[in-house]
Amino acid sequence: LGEVVMAPEKVVPYFGTVDKPECHLLYNVTTMASTWHTVATKDVSLLRRQLDIISNLPRDYVCQNYLRCHDDIGWGLDYEYLENFGIQEVPHKKYLNDFLTGKYPNSFARGELYNDDPRLGDARLCGTTASLCGIERFGFEGNQEGVDKAVRYDITLHAFMLSQSGIPVIYSGDEIGQVNDYTYKDDPEKAADSRYLHRGNFDWKLAENRHDPATVQGKLFPALDKLEHIRTSHSVFNSNVPFHTIDTWDNSILAFVRENDEEKFIGIYNFSENDKVAWINEEDGMYTDLISGRELEAKGVQIPAFGCYWLCRSKK
């Protein structure tokens, strides 16, 4: 197991070769960071590029996929690619951090900086998935509509992570939507390290709410549990199954296809706060959304704000 913080195409040597493997499993740091970049920018271009690169790696190379972990989020993005869009590294990092710490106007995220270096204009980011998705902000404000949308986004981000090739990992507390733990500031041994913001003890009392559908936990926990069961019951999610991205003709919507001899899967993810249409055009019949059970064609798919679809069609 290894951790390499660099672009996917530069990770390949650390795996060794198929005949002579070195690392058998690597943290998928770049896709994680690119996911949060996409949350802040609402533009999937970079994330799609990451998936395109990974899709061309040998299937023997296995990644450990995650949204959050014990450590901070470092912005090791493909800045050479982003320069094609006029995006420069230092100001872009500042924007990402401003958005995800809630400083940017109308940001729903609540995080904190780690290792802030004003001289270099560089800093890393800390925070739980729930807080970065808006559950903390809207919960504090008593905005139920905002909370519901934030929970939907939390589920969508986990659905995206769970549909990638590799081994998915859900960070402790994310399954019940735990928000940031600011009590670390009261401990002299922890106060200087903002990573403790997302290292709070698992809240077992909060976890009891998972049986109440009116609560955040009662919406989030069953949804993630369902996604996990769907993933384990469909062979199309196996790591050896090839995948490729497809055009949606909307920069805020990501879609990719996984396909084997048994099934064809299309994952669609809306990173926008607005309802959208994914202008895909798969002309091979009806699909079933594995999440809702709804049947629909994979054409001009209407997708709610921060929503997702797991469309699947049996080939038997």
Model-inferred region functions:
Residues L1-K316:
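Active-site and adjacent substrate-binding regions of carbohydrate-active enzymes
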